[in-house]
């Protein structure tokens, strides 16, 4: 990882959860059983999918001078758990 922290920033996390919750609210199928997420609420399901790295999403981080780096959500969640341990939620 060359750009940014080895975990999702609060802005990246909020954006992904918001977009996914919107998708779920207009009828997209959840990638997990809602019972595993503990709720049928689209926001709770979206949080569960993001926090467990289930979504097939890539984050693209830009450099000020141009260029950037693409990182998968599952890899960022994995790195965050290695670094932050139980503090990562």
Swiss-Prot record:
What are the annotated disulfide bridges?
none
Concerning its family, UniProt says: Belongs to the archaeal Rpo6/eukaryotic RPB6 RNA polymerase subunit family.
Tell me yes or no: is Transcription among this UniProt entry's keywords: yes
Q: Name one GO molecular function term.
A: DNA-directed RNA polymerase activity
Its UniProt entry gives the catalysed reaction(s) as: RNA(n) + a ribonucleoside 5'-triphosphate = RNA(n+1) + diphosphate
Q: Which GO terms describe its biological process?
A: transcription by RNA polymerase I; transcription by RNA polymerase II; tRNA transcription by RNA polymerase III
Name used for this protein in its record: DNA-directed RNA polymerase subunit Rpo6
Biological role stated in the UniProt entry: DNA-dependent RNA polymerase (RNAP) catalyzes the transcription of DNA into RNA using the four ribonucleoside triphosphates as substrates.
Q: Which organism is it from?
A: Aeropyrum pernix (strain ATCC 700893 / DSM 11879 / JCM 9820 / NBRC 100138 / K1)
Output the InterPro entries linked to this UniProt entry: DNA-dir_RNA_polK_14-18kDa_CS, Pol_omega/Rpo6/RPB6, RPB6/omega-like_sf, Rpo6/Rpb6
């Amino acid at each position: 990882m060359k750009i940014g922290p080895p975990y999702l920033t609060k802005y990246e996390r909020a954006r992904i959860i918001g977009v996914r919750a919107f998708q779920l609210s207009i009828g997209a199928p959840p990638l997990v059983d809602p019972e595993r997420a503990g709720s049928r609420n689209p926001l709770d399901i979206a949080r569960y999918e993001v926090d467990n790295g289930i979504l097939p999403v890539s984050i693209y981080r830009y450099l000020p001078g141009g260029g950037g780096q693409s990182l998968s959500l599952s890899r960022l969640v994995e790195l965050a758990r290695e670094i932050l341990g139980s503090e990562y939620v």
